[in-house]
């Protein structure tokens, strides 16, 4: 990292500050724009930018390519200054973020939290309005102001019981950041960088979101979600209570019951046709490109090929035939209220990666998408005992050390979000929103493993969690459990001959990240190192485990140790920088550091009679409880 890392960080942060306000006074006005910016600025300022929308994404990708292609850091900054005030506000932030993450001279630079750049995507409009009222009322302009987050619903709606999860700032920021790290329009040729197993990561990260959501539903006494399956059925209602500061209009409220309608760019029939073509390809075991060449959907690369097609990304083998099912589905649902733009309303939250997780239909839609991936997985043979075993390694005992052994406690805690970096309140004091989020007590896994061989061995420890019972308190079958297994951690262990005690703290999870540096902390130099830029993509640590219930909800804890020498990809090691959230986000500029399928061993179906294959010496199933206070 160059010695002036803090200065570079500060120059970039200026571009994000007050992103919806003009910066001509700050950066100056260029009369003549750089020719590289020709054709950029089509999406007007004030419009809602969506990286699910084909045209929006195309423009954002062109801008990102220009910014990444700048030869020097100064040229990069100059291009940013030129386009900052004529490019759509959210599109600019998205493209700038993609560029920062992928420019070699920006390695070590941290992105500011998206929730501080666009708090209007995370904070109810009633709360923001209250903050402005308080800022006006306080005579002392140097005082900090704190307002409480307003509720977005009532208990009359059963889904409101899950608002704490769907509207959690951390997971919505994670979703936005994941799609910045893995843009669907990423062009490997132009960017000179291939995103390893990007299609499979798209499948796995969203599959885990669905599994986690169902675990939360069961924690709250609700039934598991019903997957979306019929393009003509009415959708449940949802009111996000968000309003865009880019144009002052609210994100569209979806009343009940409404059904999907055709838009100018895409029709409901298009989505149905793409679904059937993708399912046909899965059943045939191959996809066809525009030239008629066939690509087998095999057990090694098939899921990656399928992920690129379903999303769809630039890596899709045939976008003309298989379309863009996932992306256009988001757009159609977001525009259900005003599909032809007759009333000039904003789309709903499904249009935006920073807001879509708030809507219950997001999870039903992604369970539908995941069901298509599972159709492919059902074509693969179940794992054999040989594929699941690690000869000579035996897990003797697993404990979870917390305040009470094998009981993890969750609770709601308070946190603050500063919003004065986005809005001009006319004061020097900070303006913050106080809100609550779910959190868990710290805990430590104690895994006793015996290495029966006479030599040192290395293993990959994989830890998963799934509820014991369904919504009717029936025990879940192995196949049902498989779809609900959430990954808690994956790490390397060293196994000396004899008995080994391996301890792993929950904060070190390969799934999660701890808190990102805040905007003001970044200005002071915190976070400028090589271990940050991809790491901020991970799942929030405070939602590592589900909520549980007040009685202590029982969960299966599965611990599996596999052969690290087989799992290892190339010369990659877990000591490489920036792998704290490798499970969902991969590793920076590297191959995905695990040869196994993502979600292994629960990625493939477990037919009746095959569950015993998992009962190996190197696999442990135990029960723990998660208790909510």
Swiss-Prot record:
Disulfide topology: 537-585
Keyword field: Copper, Disulfide bond, Glycoprotein, Metal-binding, Oxygen transport, Secreted, Transport
Residues noted as binding Cu cation 2 in the record, renumbered to the chain: 326, 330, 366
Listed InterPro entries: Di-copper_centre_dom_sf (IPR008922), Hemocyanin/hexamerin (IPR013788), Hemocyanin/hexamerin_mid_dom (IPR000896), Hemocyanin_C (IPR005203), Hemocyanin_C_sf (IPR037020), Hemocyanin_N (IPR005204), Hemocyanin_N_sf (IPR036697), Ig_E-set (IPR014756)
UniProt KW Membrane keyword: no
Keyword Glycoprotein carried by entry: yes
Free-text tissue specificity from the UniProt record: Hemolymph.
GO MF terms held by the record: chloride ion binding; copper ion binding; oxidoreductase activity; oxygen carrier activity
The organism's place on the tree of life at top rank: Eukaryota
Glycosylation sites: 451, 618
Main localization (coarse): secreted
Subunit annotation: Tarantula hemocyanin is a 24-chain polymer with seven different chains identified.
Family: Belongs to the tyrosinase family. Hemocyanin subfamily.
Note: The two copper ions bound each have 3 nitrogen ligands (presumably contributed by His residues) and share a bridging ligand (possibly contributed by a Tyr residue) in addition to binding oxygen.
Function (record text): Hemocyanins are copper-containing oxygen carriers occurring freely dissolved in the hemolymph of many mollusks and arthropods.
Entry protein name: Hemocyanin C chain
Lineage: Eukaryota, Metazoa, Ecdysozoa, Arthropoda, Chelicerata
Gene encoding the protein: HCC
């Amino acid at each position: 990292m160059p010695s002036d890392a803090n200065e570079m960080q500060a120059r970039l942060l200026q571009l994000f500050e007050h992103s919806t306000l003009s910066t001509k006074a700050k950066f100056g006005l260029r009369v003549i724009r750089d020719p590289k910016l020709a054709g950029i600025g089509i999406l007007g300022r004030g419009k809602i930018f969506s990286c699910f929308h084909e045209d929006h994404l195309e423009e954002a990708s062109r801008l990102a390519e220009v910014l990444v292609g700048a030869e020097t850091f100064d040229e990069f900054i100059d291009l940013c200054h030129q386009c900052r005030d004529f490019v759509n506000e959210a599109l600019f932030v998205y493209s700038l973020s993609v560029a920062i993450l992928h420019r070699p001279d920006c390695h070590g630079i941290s992105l500011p939290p998206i929730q501080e750049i666009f708090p209007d995507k995370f904070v109810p409009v009633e709360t923001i309005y209250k903050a402005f009222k308080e800022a006006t009322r306080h005579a002392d302009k140097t005082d900090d102001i704190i307002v409480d987050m307003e509720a977005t619903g009532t208990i009359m709606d059963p889904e409101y019981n899950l608002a704490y999860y769907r509207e959690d700032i951390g997971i919505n920021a994670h979703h936005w950041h994941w799609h910045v790290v893995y843009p669907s329009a990423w062009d490997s040729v132009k960017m000179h960088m291939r995103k390893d197993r990007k299609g499979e990561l798209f499948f796995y990260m969203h599959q885990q979101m669905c599994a986690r959501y169902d675990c939360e539903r069961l924690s709250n006494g609700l039934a598991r979600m019903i997957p979306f399956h019929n393009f003509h059925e009415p959708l449940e209602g949802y009111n996000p209570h968000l309003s865009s500061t880019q144009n002052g209009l609210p994100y569209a409220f979806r009343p009940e019951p409404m059904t999907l309608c055709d838009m100018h760019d895409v029709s409901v029939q298009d989505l149905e046709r793409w679904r059937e073509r993708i399912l046909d390809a899965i059943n045939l075991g191959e996809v066809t490109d525009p030239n008629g060449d066939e690509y087998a959907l095999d057990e090694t690369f098939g899921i990656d090929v399928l992920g690129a097609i379903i999303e769809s990304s630039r890596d899709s083998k045939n976008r003309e035939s298989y379309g863009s099912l996932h992306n256009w589905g988001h757009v159609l649902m977001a525009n259900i209220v005003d599909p032809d733009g007759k009333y000039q309303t904003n789309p709903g939250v499904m249009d935006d990666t920073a807001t879509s997780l708030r809507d219950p239909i997001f999870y039903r839609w992604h369970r539908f998408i995941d069901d298509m991936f599972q159709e492919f997985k059902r074509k693969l043979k179940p794992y054999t005992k040989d594929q699941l075993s690690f000869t000579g390694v035996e897990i003797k005992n697993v404990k979870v050390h917390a305040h009470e052994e094998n009981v993890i406690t969750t609770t709601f805690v308070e946190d603050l979000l500063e919003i004065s970096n986005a809005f001009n309140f006319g004061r020097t004091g900070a303006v913050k929103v106080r809100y609550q989020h779910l959190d868990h007590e710290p805990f430590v896994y104690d895994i006793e493993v015996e290495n029966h061989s006479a030599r040192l061995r290395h293993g990959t420890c994989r830890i998963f969690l799934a509820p014991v019972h369904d919504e009717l308190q029936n025990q879940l079958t192995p196949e049902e459990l498989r779809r609900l297994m959430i990954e808690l951690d994956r790490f390397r262990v060293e196994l000396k001959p004899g008995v080994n005690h391996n301890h792993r703290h929950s904060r070190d999870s390969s799934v999660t990240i701890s808190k990102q540096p805040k905007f003001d902390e970044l200005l002071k130099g915190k976070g400028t190192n090589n271990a940050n830029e991809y790491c901020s993509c991970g799942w929030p640590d405070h939602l590592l485990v589900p909520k549980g219930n007040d009685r202590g909800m029982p969960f299966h804890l599965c611990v599996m140790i596999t052969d690290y020498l087989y799992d290892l990809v190339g010369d990659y090691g877990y000591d490489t920088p920036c792998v704290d959230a490798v499970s969902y986000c991969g590793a920076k500029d590297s191959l995905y550091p695990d040869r196994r399928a993502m979600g292994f061993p629960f990625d493939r179906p477990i037919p009746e009679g095959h569950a015993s294959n998992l009962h190996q010496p190197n696999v442990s199933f135990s029960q723990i409880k998660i208790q909510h206070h």
